[in-house]
A protein has these predicted regions:
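Bacterial Sec-dependent N-terminal signal peptides
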Residues: 1-24
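Short, polar/acidic, helix-capping and beta-turn segments at strand->helix junctions
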Residues: 19-179
Protein backbone atom coordinates (compact mmCIF):
# COMPACT_ATOMS: atom_id res chain seq x y z
CA UNK A 1 0.00 0.00 0.00
CA UNK A 2 2.79 2.40 0.94
CA UNK A 3 4.54 1.61 -2.35
CA UNK A 4 1.35 2.36 -4.32
CA UNK A 5 0.89 5.68 -2.53
CA UNK A 6 4.47 6.73 -3.30
CA UNK A 7 4.01 5.69 -6.94
CA UNK A 8 0.80 7.73 -7.22
CA UNK A 9 2.44 10.78 -5.62
CA UNK A 10 5.45 10.61 -7.95
CA UNK A 11 3.13 10.15 -10.94
CA UNK A 12 1.16 13.25 -9.99
CA UNK A 13 4.39 15.17 -9.49
CA UNK A 14 5.65 14.24 -12.96
CA UNK A 15 2.29 14.93 -14.59
CA UNK A 16 2.39 18.39 -13.07
CA UNK A 17 5.85 19.04 -14.53
CA UNK A 18 5.30 20.18 -18.10
CA UNK A 19 8.69 20.73 -19.72
CA UNK A 20 7.10 22.81 -22.45
CA UNK A 21 5.00 25.14 -20.36
CA UNK A 22 3.33 27.42 -22.85
CA UNK A 23 1.08 29.19 -20.36
CA UNK A 24 3.96 31.38 -19.15
CA UNK A 25 2.43 34.78 -18.41
CA UNK A 26 5.78 36.47 -19.11
CA UNK A 27 5.76 35.19 -22.71
CA UNK A 28 5.38 38.27 -24.91
CA UNK A 29 6.99 38.05 -28.35
CA UNK A 30 5.88 41.56 -29.28
CA UNK A 31 7.70 42.98 -26.26
CA UNK A 32 10.77 40.95 -27.29
CA UNK A 33 10.56 42.43 -30.80
CA UNK A 34 10.46 45.91 -29.29
CA UNK A 35 13.44 45.11 -27.05
CA UNK A 36 15.35 43.90 -30.12
CA UNK A 37 14.47 47.11 -31.98
CA UNK A 38 12.47 45.25 -34.61
CA UNK A 39 9.44 46.85 -36.24
CA UNK A 40 7.41 44.38 -38.25
CA UNK A 41 6.78 45.39 -41.86
CA UNK A 42 3.51 45.09 -43.73
CA UNK A 43 2.96 41.56 -45.01
CA UNK A 44 3.85 41.10 -48.65
CA UNK A 45 1.30 39.67 -51.07
CA UNK A 46 1.87 36.31 -52.73
CA UNK A 47 3.66 36.60 -56.07
CA UNK A 48 1.85 33.66 -57.71
CA UNK A 49 -1.22 31.44 -57.28
CA UNK A 50 -0.99 30.65 -53.56
CA UNK A 51 -1.87 32.16 -50.18
CA UNK A 52 0.47 33.42 -47.44
CA UNK A 53 -0.92 31.16 -44.73
CA UNK A 54 -3.23 28.23 -44.15
CA UNK A 55 -4.62 27.16 -40.77
CA UNK A 56 -5.45 23.48 -40.43
CA UNK A 57 -6.53 22.39 -36.97
CA UNK A 58 -4.09 24.06 -34.61
CA UNK A 59 -1.30 24.29 -37.20
CA UNK A 60 -0.37 27.39 -39.18
CA UNK A 61 1.51 26.83 -42.43
CA UNK A 62 3.39 29.88 -43.71
CA UNK A 63 4.39 30.04 -47.38
CA UNK A 64 7.97 30.73 -48.38
CA UNK A 65 9.16 34.28 -47.81
CA UNK A 66 12.31 36.05 -48.90
CA UNK A 67 14.52 38.89 -47.69
CA UNK A 68 12.21 41.76 -48.68
CA UNK A 69 13.66 45.11 -47.63
CA UNK A 70 11.66 48.17 -46.56
CA UNK A 71 12.24 49.80 -49.96
CA UNK A 72 10.38 46.94 -51.68
CA UNK A 73 13.47 45.27 -53.13
CA UNK A 74 14.95 41.93 -52.17
CA UNK A 75 18.44 40.96 -51.12
CA UNK A 76 19.49 39.11 -54.24
CA UNK A 77 22.37 36.96 -55.38
CA UNK A 78 24.16 33.69 -54.91
CA UNK A 79 26.01 32.96 -51.69
CA UNK A 80 29.64 32.26 -52.49
CA UNK A 81 29.59 34.54 -55.53
CA UNK A 82 27.55 37.70 -54.90
CA UNK A 83 27.05 37.42 -51.13
CA UNK A 84 29.22 36.39 -48.20
CA UNK A 85 27.88 33.88 -45.67
CA UNK A 86 27.43 36.77 -43.17
CA UNK A 87 25.41 38.80 -45.70
CA UNK A 88 23.30 35.71 -46.37
CA UNK A 89 22.84 35.20 -42.59
CA UNK A 90 21.45 38.76 -42.43
CA UNK A 91 19.18 37.98 -45.41
CA UNK A 92 17.84 34.95 -43.53
CA UNK A 93 17.29 37.10 -40.42
CA UNK A 94 15.35 39.64 -42.50
CA UNK A 95 13.34 36.78 -43.96
CA UNK A 96 12.57 35.68 -40.39
CA UNK A 97 11.24 39.16 -39.63
CA UNK A 98 9.02 38.92 -42.71
CA UNK A 99 7.79 35.49 -41.58
CA UNK A 100 6.92 36.85 -38.12
CA UNK A 101 5.03 39.73 -39.77
CA UNK A 102 3.09 37.17 -41.82
CA UNK A 103 2.31 35.15 -38.69
CA UNK A 104 1.06 38.27 -36.89
CA UNK A 105 -1.08 39.21 -39.89
CA UNK A 106 -2.65 35.75 -39.84
CA UNK A 107 -3.30 35.31 -36.10
CA UNK A 108 -3.25 38.84 -34.67
CA UNK A 109 -1.54 38.11 -31.36
CA UNK A 110 1.90 36.48 -31.41
CA UNK A 111 1.24 35.08 -27.93
CA UNK A 112 -1.01 32.54 -29.67
CA UNK A 113 2.13 30.79 -30.95
CA UNK A 114 2.50 27.60 -28.95
CA UNK A 115 5.61 26.38 -30.78
CA UNK A 116 7.51 26.79 -34.03
CA UNK A 117 7.56 23.22 -35.35
CA UNK A 118 9.46 23.24 -38.64
CA UNK A 119 11.58 25.65 -40.66
CA UNK A 120 12.68 24.90 -44.21
CA UNK A 121 15.41 27.20 -45.49
CA UNK A 122 16.58 27.31 -49.08
CA UNK A 123 19.84 29.10 -49.88
CA UNK A 124 20.62 30.39 -53.38
CA UNK A 125 24.26 29.29 -53.55
CA UNK A 126 27.08 28.30 -55.84
CA UNK A 127 27.58 24.51 -56.05
CA UNK A 128 30.74 24.54 -53.92
CA UNK A 129 29.09 26.43 -51.02
CA UNK A 130 28.34 24.07 -48.12
CA UNK A 131 27.48 26.24 -45.10
CA UNK A 132 23.72 26.40 -45.66
CA UNK A 133 22.94 25.73 -41.97
CA UNK A 134 25.01 28.75 -40.90
CA UNK A 135 23.02 30.95 -43.29
CA UNK A 136 19.60 29.72 -42.14
CA UNK A 137 20.70 30.26 -38.53
CA UNK A 138 19.90 33.91 -39.27
CA UNK A 139 16.21 32.98 -39.17
CA UNK A 140 16.48 30.27 -36.51
CA UNK A 141 18.43 32.50 -34.12
CA UNK A 142 15.81 35.23 -34.52
CA UNK A 143 12.91 32.85 -33.84
CA UNK A 144 14.54 31.73 -30.60
CA UNK A 145 15.31 35.34 -29.61
CA UNK A 146 11.67 36.34 -30.16
CA UNK A 147 9.78 33.22 -29.04
CA UNK A 148 12.24 31.72 -26.53
CA UNK A 149 11.90 27.95 -26.09
CA UNK A 150 8.74 28.07 -28.21
CA UNK A 151 10.95 29.18 -31.10
CA UNK A 152 13.16 26.06 -31.10
CA UNK A 153 12.26 23.95 -34.11
CA UNK A 154 13.17 21.16 -36.45
CA UNK A 155 14.77 22.35 -39.65
CA UNK A 156 16.11 21.68 -43.10
CA UNK A 157 18.71 23.99 -44.65
CA UNK A 158 19.46 23.21 -48.27
CA UNK A 159 21.27 24.76 -51.20
CA UNK A 160 19.51 25.62 -54.44
CA UNK A 161 20.81 26.36 -57.92
CA UNK A 162 18.38 29.28 -58.14
CA UNK A 163 15.46 30.87 -56.33
CA UNK A 164 12.62 33.09 -57.63
CA UNK A 165 13.80 36.57 -58.64
CA UNK A 166 17.35 35.52 -57.67
CA UNK A 167 16.57 36.10 -53.96
CA UNK A 168 19.32 35.01 -51.57
CA UNK A 169 17.13 32.79 -49.37
CA UNK A 170 13.57 31.53 -49.16
CA UNK A 171 12.18 30.18 -45.90
CA UNK A 172 8.83 28.68 -44.95
CA UNK A 173 7.62 27.36 -41.63
CA UNK A 174 4.98 25.45 -39.73
CA UNK A 175 3.88 26.38 -36.23
CA UNK A 176 1.43 25.20 -33.62
CA UNK A 177 -1.18 27.57 -32.22
CA UNK A 178 -2.55 27.67 -28.70
CA UNK A 179 -5.99 26.05 -28.38
Amino acid sequence: MKHKLITVLFSLLFLGCNTQNTSDSSFDPELRLKELGIVLPETSSPVANYVNTVVSGNLLYVSGKGPLKSDGTYIEGKVGKDLTPEEAYQAARLTGINLIATIKSAIGDLRKVKRIIRVTGMVNAVPEFSEHPKVINGCSDLLVQVFGERGRHTRAAVGMGSLPSNIAVEIDLILELED
